[in-house]
Amino acid sequence: LGDGVAGSGIIDYNLNISPGPNQVGFDFSHIMADTQDRVPTVYIENGKVVNLDPNDPIEVNFFHQNKHDDYGLPTGLKNPEMTTMKWHHGHNGSIINGVPRIGYMKGGKNALWSDIDMADHFLDKSIEYIKANKSRPFFLFYSLQQPHVPRTPHPRFEGQSGMGPRGDAIIEADWSIGELYKTLQSEDLLDNTFI
């Protein structure tokens, strides 16, 4: 969805978010609001933030002027001891799940994703979609968040590549594609599917 109109950051994540995939022909969408390294760290399904509590609205700001003051959540710049990885290249905003992000965020606590569970989450959603739609032709756009920064593979993949977090995230991505392939096989869809 980007950073808002002309980079203004003006998207109200507490309302129906549009335009999005549903406005360009997708019957169903389950996406990230932006890249994994930016706020807000929430999933959006059919234009609505998943698990958003209306009593804890989301506020996003990419233009917080005082970089040394926290904006809602602690920041990587001011609170490096709270991070699980060193920040770099502007990734020093709000800390969520130990990861310093680009941008600043307040609210939306119940809607926050778990970085280490993202591959499983998107895989499960995709498998669910395949099984629910297997009796008719469908188009599934399965876009992997790995190996984009912050590269947070699930612990079961940590150290598997011998090449650090990026290599481990690639191993996780490869596993995810394999699981999707197995689903197409088990649902007897593989012979009638373009991958």
Where are the regions a protein language model picked out?
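Metal-dependent active-site segment of extracytoplasmic phospho-/sulfohydrolases and closely related
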Residues: 172-195
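Loop/turn elements at helix/coil->beta-strand transitions in domains of secreted/extracellular proteins
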Residues: 24-27, 133-140, 188-195
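Active-site His/acidic residue clusters
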Residues: 40, 45-48, 126-168
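Non-transmembrane alpha-helical segments in soluble domains
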Residues: 27-30, 41, 127-131, 181, ...
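The substrate-binding groove and active-site-proximal loops of carbohydrate-active enzymes
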Residues: 104-120, 159-172
